[in-house]
């Protein structure tokens, strides 16, 4: 299954706020009822499916990519769900987003694909690059790159930078301090349901 490129409002209307996908929010009218879920008993499968979809759309992954991360998480030590979230949070495109250098994860992915981003002074154009503690993220020293990032930093409302990252606004430089803690993952998600959804596929 390919990466979703359709209307983003349609997705957040169904799944709720997904800040990585879009910074738009829905304002329901007073007394609004979601007709797709009202007066219906929601199955456990659907609940798990929707949690999985939240994760996939928020981080902008294909089905195959998400399944790959689940398999890696299952082989690692610790809680599979927590490891899964940490793997996704440490992707370069997500780190760029969390630093406030792009308004969304798709926007961050575009910056990486267009070779605007440096890791430890080397160009990295792979959005899925796994960032590690002590990695330094900077912008390529060319007018176009600097202009795009400066515009993003000045134009979009900033989320609080999580404790595993540091950002120097004057130098436009980010630093990965550590692997992210679960409490700093601000997506409203039950990762255990995602693991359960994939339990027969891994």
From Swiss-Prot:
SUPFAM superfamilies in UniProt: Alpha-L RNA-binding motif (SSF55174)
Cell compartment(s), UniProt: Plastid, Chloroplast
GO molecular function ontology, one term from the record: rRNA binding
GO CC, alphabetical: chloroplast; small ribosomal subunit
Entry-linked Gene3D superfamilies: Ribosomal Protein S4 Delta 41, Chain A, domain 1, RNA-binding S4 domain
Keyword Nuclease applies: no
Keyword terms: Chloroplast, Plastid, Ribonucleoprotein, Ribosomal protein, RNA-binding, rRNA-binding
PROSITE patterns per record: RIBOSOMAL_S4 (PS00632), S4 (PS50889)
Disulfides per UniProt: none
GO biological process: ribosomal small subunit biogenesis; translation
Residues covered by the S4 RNA-binding domain: 90-154
Transmembrane segments annotated in the record for this chain: none
NCBIfam families per UniProt: PRK05327.1, rpsD_bact
Subunit structure: Part of the 30S ribosomal subunit. Contacts protein S5. The interaction surface between S4 and S5 is involved in control of translational fidelity.
Described purpose of this protein according to its UniProt entry: One of the primary rRNA binding proteins, it binds directly to 16S rRNA where it nucleates assembly of the body of the 30S subunit.
Entry similarity comment: Belongs to the universal ribosomal protein uS4 family.
Stated name of the protein: Small ribosomal subunit protein uS4c
Source organism of the structure: Ricciocarpos natans (Liverwort)
Lineage: Eukaryota, Viridiplantae, Streptophyta, Embryophyta, Marchantiophyta
Gene: rps4
